[in-house]
Design a protein with these regions (language model features):
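Structured soluble/peripheral alpha/beta segments that form catalytic or ligand/cofactor-binding pockets
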Residues: 1-203
């Protein structure tokens, strides 16, 4: 969660015994995620890194419709990506920190039989809202064997996602602290208004 003067980031390692799953629920430690067929509800009870501030509250993502297609990221078939809800509505209600917000959102998932870093040297993703029910997504990944995955999709959960010609490469400036490259694609070009995350592995 990003606020004007601070951010709240949690990525807590848990033991296998802390995991519970069912067809509609995922629980890891004190936090859980459940789906009722139309809404994904996330109940959070975590601590941020590195200062251990509380992150506690609820996030509800309305998903009245979803896409039904997964995309292969490599010809070997070991990796797939599914833009489940290219457009969605999100409601954030946190007690700690005190945050209330509603707006546009997105849900996707990556899956595979081997780790992403075993196959790919890097991967890049961007998404732009194109109205209340549509968006445009660019997904690009470069494999260690020289293969490249590049796809540009337009649409939404009700109409599905249609392939488009990919925009030309127009890289963002490198990250301000760790200097990680930020490849991107756009017809118009762009400026960096704010860098939300700048780490050695994700910028």
């Amino acid at each position: 969660f990003y606020e004007p003067r601070q951010k709240h980031w949690a990525m807590t390692e848990r033991r296998a015994r802390d995991l519970q799953t069912s067809s509609s629920m995922l629980k890891i430690g004190p936090s859980s995620m459940s789906f009722d067929g139309e809404s994904l509800t996330v109940d959070l009870d975590e601590r941020s890194a590195p200062f251990r501030r509380a992150i506690r509250g609820k996030v509800v993502i309305d998903i009245p419709a979803h896409t039904d297609r997964c995309y292969a990221l490599h010809s070997a078939g070991e990796h797939r990506w599914w833009p489940i809800a290219p457009t969605a509505r999100v409601k954030v209600s946190l007690d700690a920190p005190s945050v209330r917000w509603e707006g546009a959102g997105y849900v996707d998932t990556n899956g595979g039989t081997v780790a992403l870093e075993d196959t790919f040297t890097d991967w890049h993703w961007s998404r732009a809202d194109m109205g209340p029910e549509n968006c445009r997504i660019v997904y690009e990944a470069h494999a260690r064997d020289g293969e490249t995955c590049l796809m540009t999709l337009f649409g939404g959960p009700k109409t599905g996602m249609a392939s488009e010609h990919s925009p030309p490469r127009r890289d963002l400036s490198v990250g301000p602290i760790w200097r990680v490259s930020r490849p991107a694609r756009s017809y118009q070009g762009f400026n960096v208004e704010k860098t939300l995350e700048d780490t050695p592995f994700y910028t």
